[in-house]
Every structure is written in C-alpha cells, then in structure tokens.
C-alpha cells in the first residue's frame, strides 16, 4: 500500500514522541467521547474525530506496546451517564475500524482473505450499507416482545432507555412473523430526518430554547430524555443492522439476517447491497456518496461486512473492533477563518496545551470557535520528530487558518494561508512558566532523537494546582477509586481549602473541617453573587442543614468503603501516563500487591537502558529491531572468531553496508562508531527491566513511564502515604477458559486447520500469551508438520507439546 502523509509522519516518530502524541490523542478522544456520547454536545465533526482515531491507531500499529494503555485505545464510546439505570450488554457493542481511501478497502479485503487462508478461486461476499450518523441502540426482545432498550455506553454497559424507545414509531414493541428466536438482541441506529430536524429546531426557536447543532445531537438528546413524553414529541426513526445475543442461530449470512429483520417488522436500510469484490464495494460507496445530499438523513460513510457468518466467527475481533467489518468514511470538511488568540491550559500530566480561539465559522453544519493546536512544536511548524511540518510555516495570532473537522472531537488548525498573514503578525512565544503555578515549563531533550520534545511541560508536579486537581479528579473517578459523591466540585473545594493535596489526604478527612470547607465555599459564592447585584440566597433551614450533614457523612462513608481496592484500579487511579485500564490489569495479573510491584520497578530502574543504547535505535536504517538483533550475542560469530577484532569492530561488521553508512555519518569515524557500539553494549537493559518491557501487555513505553513516575521522590512518597491509608487486593479473575488464562503458548510448524493469525487470536482471546520463542517459562507448544528447533527447545525445558488436533480439542473444552 502506498505511503501516506500520516503513515510517513508516524514512521518518523521516536518512541518518546509517539508516547507523548498517543497520550495527547487519547485525551482528545476521551474528551470527545464524553461530549459525544454522554453530553450530546460534540466539539468536533466526525471527520476530525476519525482523523484523531486514525492517527492513534497508526501510532499503535508501529508501537504495539501503546495499544490498550488508555481508555481511548482500549474502550468504545464513553461511560454511561449516571442519569439512567445501567444495562450490561450480553454481547459488547463494539466500534468499527475505519477506511479513508480506496486502498484501505483493497487492503481490508486482502487482509480478510489472508486471515482465512482462502485459495484464489474462492470468493468472499460483503454487504455494503450506508453508515447512519445517529445514536447506537440495542433492543432486547424476549418471546418477540421488547423488554429492554439500551444505548451503547462504553460498549460493555449502556443506559436503559426502554420507555423512550417504545415511543419511536419505527421500533416495534412486538415482532411479527415466523421463527423468531426466544431471545434476540437487535442493534441499530436512532436518527432524525433533515425535515424533522428542521421542524424540531423551529419549535425550539419559537420557545426561546437553544437550537440543536445537528440531527445527530438532536436524536441523541431526544432519546436520552428523562421524560419519555419529550421523546415521543420528536419523530425519531430507526434502522436495524446487527444483533447481539440470540438464543439460537437463525441464518448463516449477514444479508439473510437483514431479510429476517425486515420480515419481523424491523426497518432495514434499503440501500444495502451485496458485493463480491473490493471494486464492487468501492463502486457502491461512490453511488452512496453521490446520493448523500438527497437521502434526507445524515450518513458519514459506508459499512462493509463479511457476509458469511461462519467467516465472521473465524475472523473474530481485535481490540475494540471486529476483523470482519470496516467503515469507509467520507472525507473531512474544512473552513477558513481568523485566529483571534492562543490560550494555554495545563493538562493533568503537566503539558502546556495551546488552544486556538477562532472567529466563529461553520464547518460541516456546526459552528466552531475553538480548535486544538496540539503542542508548542506544532505551533512552530515542527513535528514530534523535530522535522518541519506545513513546510515549516508557524502559526501566529491574526493568521488566516484552515480549520478541519474530522469527527466529533475538538477541531484542529490544519494550516495557515500564508498569503493573508498580516504584516504585524509576530511568532507566538510560549510561556516559560506554568500559567497555573508559576513553576518552570520546559521542553526536555529526547534521548532517543537528540531533539527537543514537541510538548512543553510544567515541572511543578504535585504542587501545581492544575495537575493536582486533575489528578485528584481522575483518582476519584468511576474507573479509579470510584468514590461516590466526590464530584469535580468537591475536589476543587477541598483542594482550594488545603484539605486535600494528594490522594492520601482524602482518607484523612474529618467531619468538621470538611463541613467548614463546604460552608466557606458557599459563603464565597454568595458574596460574589451579591457583588454582581444578584439577590442573596436564603439562609439554610434546619432541615437543609441536617441534609447537608447527612451528605457529608455519606462522603466519609464512601471513603471508608474504599479502604480496600483491587490492585488494577489502584494503579489506574494514580494517573500515571501510559497506564490505562488495560496496562493496569496486566500489571495486576503479574504482581500480587504494590510493594512487590514497586520492588520490581526499583530493580528495573537500576537495569534500565543507557543513553547510547537508546540513541542507536533513533539512527536512520537502524531502529529497535536491528539494534536488538545486533547485540543478541557479544561472543564472536563463526566468521569473526578467526579475526583479532575489538567488540566494537565486530559489532560494526555485522551491520549492512547502508547501516554502516548511517552510523558513520552520525558518529563521524569508525573509531567513534566502535566506541559508541561498545558503550551501547554495556548499557543494554537487564532482565529486571525486560521483565516489564518485553511483556506484550506492558511494553517499553509504559515501563519507562512507570520508572519515571516512581523515580520522582514526591510521587513515591505520595503512593507510600496512600498505602498507609488503604490496602489492595489481587485482581479478580474469571473462571472461564481457566486452562489458558495467563499461560504462555508457542506455535511452531505448519498449522493445517487454522491460520497462524487465527490460532494466535484464539489463544489471546482465552487469556493466553503467545510467544515466538520457547523458554523455561513456556507452558505449551503447539506443533504442526515441519516443527524444528522449537521442538528441541521444548524437550530441553520439559515443556508440554501437543498437536494441532490436540489444541483444537482443548479449545472445544474451554
């Protein structure tokens, strides 16, 4: 597949730059998910969101250790709102991988064929249907009657909106027809037509109420009403396109499922077509794109799905999306406007994030007044790798800029119209002190690239209120300690009052100081209102006072209820960069408690790689893989043994001519190359470091982040103080597939009944770790015809060896 500007940019990223950019993208995506799924008030277009997601996935493809390290990477959608009862989906509602070019569709079809190991003469059919821009909904029917309707939520848990769904004319309360499964979960999309959207906004305007930004927001806001009467007053519509749990199989192809849906009284999009090649799929995409303006409802692409359900089951899932489906998105939308100002906010990890204040402009039907500028390097026209972007054009206040929306994430400034730059426009100078705490703000030298990081960070750590408050908010969040009642306002009040500066302080709170802080905040707000001419609020009644006391006691009770917490939640709550829910779970599976983990990290810190080792992987035509292979053994190889060479000269001789040329250009002479290689050999990471870094679920990026976090004395002290107040318990594990959970499996030789990719995916789905080499830590070797050295290694280490048939039998029992 040809290189794209995005792929080229990602290829140029160092590990540190990739980690920083991944974290930045994750924050933007997580914020966008919250605004899109829970608040129905997105700040970005679909195209902008997809661009962020595409960049995130491109980084993860090149740096696999980053996969699953953040909520944006591991999750789908956003956590469900507290306003509604929760519904756990029997089958998760996953997202889809995206395509933005015809080549992506070609590669998708080829990837499906490779995974299934299909002969050239065997065709694969795909359905192609419009991708409705609405709100995903799951309808559960039992004995043909609707019993539950739930939103997607975070993919695992959604919101119960059954009463509202029953007011939608397109959603049948009772299915009709024959052979309806006893249990049937129907997945589809709730949407509004353009005509109905215009009528709703006209009513909103007449009533003096805010207008909806677009039909998707209006549909989502209408379905997620606490009062079903409001939902009933808005003519929502529904298309069915998928299913979740079913009590028994009812057909064998995707297209036949849609026909069954239609026969049972469920509306199905009439523009769905069965295609038998990538060419047919792309042709249908072009047809839908041409019809888009006249459809009468919003779509943002075309969804392709493998038609054969047997193939779908074999293909399975990867991360948050099925391998057998793809969303081919329409192009991003752009507009030109003026950059009025650049504001700086401080992120939870101390990053100084520039935000563009724009002259309001409509992009794709939404008014945009803010856009991200990513980081200092981006403003200066320099990429994360230190190389020029936008041909080196910087961004200045007063510039005419191109703003792009690529999804429901915050818009971004893509470029500058340099011809329209005012004569008095001057380069923007980033502050060298933190706007929140006044501490120095620095751009550190990246040891891998020898260039300044793109992001400027505050050095204030826990003394910085911007970081402190945000870290505490993260700590008490639902996926962290889940402290009931401790919303953002309480955290701000307690922080400003000086009662809580670090997590341990929460568990030391007492009734009287807590009440005093709340009362003081209320009095401050009252004084502000009086100064602004507002009438003073009434004094609290005795009853109100009793209710307040009860609420404070409930807060303290919620703290006591979290004195013991699973280790993975403890780790996630600390807010360590790159330690998302997935990585926290991986660490909790490997260590029983925090003291064990911290001791292992102390050892890993002592055996961390040195600067010369890291520098090698940043050189052209070297990279981490070549570097690791180069130093696999320091002993002389057969051809080297006859020569009287230094270690550095031997290592240099193992390089290809182009690699030798690259290192010579960097270091200047063969003597300096040899010296650098010898220094690198002495700085290789030790086993204690590799225990983390070589683990496929943790990886070097997360490992370095853990080491950096615990190497800061104030962080180490804060964690130890917290451990004096709370305890941890081991990660709860499920009993299903226990035979494979945590086991290390190696596949060798030819597999005849499934592809290697399919075997690997199946093992990992059951909780096993798949390795490429056999060691004493390997639990099982699956050997097919032609197995070679790995069989001998298995015998040497006493590892159990089974055939492919034995493996399949074990899977059947799992």
UniProtKB/Swiss-Prot annotation:
- Gene3D superfamilies, from UniProt? 5' to 3' exonuclease, C-terminal subdomain, 6.20.10.30, BRCT domain, DNA ligase/mRNA capping enzyme, Helix hairpin bin, Nucleic acid-binding proteins
Q: Which residues bind NAD(+)?
A: 46-50, 95-96, 129, 152, 189, 305, 329
Report the InterPro entries cross-referenced here: BRCT_dom, BRCT_dom_sf, DisA/LigA_HHH, DNA_ligase, DNA_ligase_AS, DNA_ligase_CS, DNAligase_adenylation, DNAligase_N
Q: What GO cellular component term, any one, is given?
A: cytosol
* NCBIfam families reported for this sequence: dnlj (TIGR00575), PRK07956.1 (NF005932)
Q: What is this protein called?
A: DNA ligase
Under PANTHER family, the record lists:
CHROMOSOME TRANSMISSION FIDELITY FACTOR 18, DNA LIGASE
Could you say which cofactors this protein requires?
Mg(2+); Mn(2+)
Catalytic activity field: NAD(+) + (deoxyribonucleotide)n-3'-hydroxyl + 5'-phospho-(deoxyribonucleotide)m = (deoxyribonucleotide)n+m + AMP + beta-nicotinamide D-nucleotide
Keywords assigned by UniProt, alphabetized: DNA damage, DNA repair, DNA replication, Ligase, Magnesium, Manganese, Metal-binding, NAD, Zinc
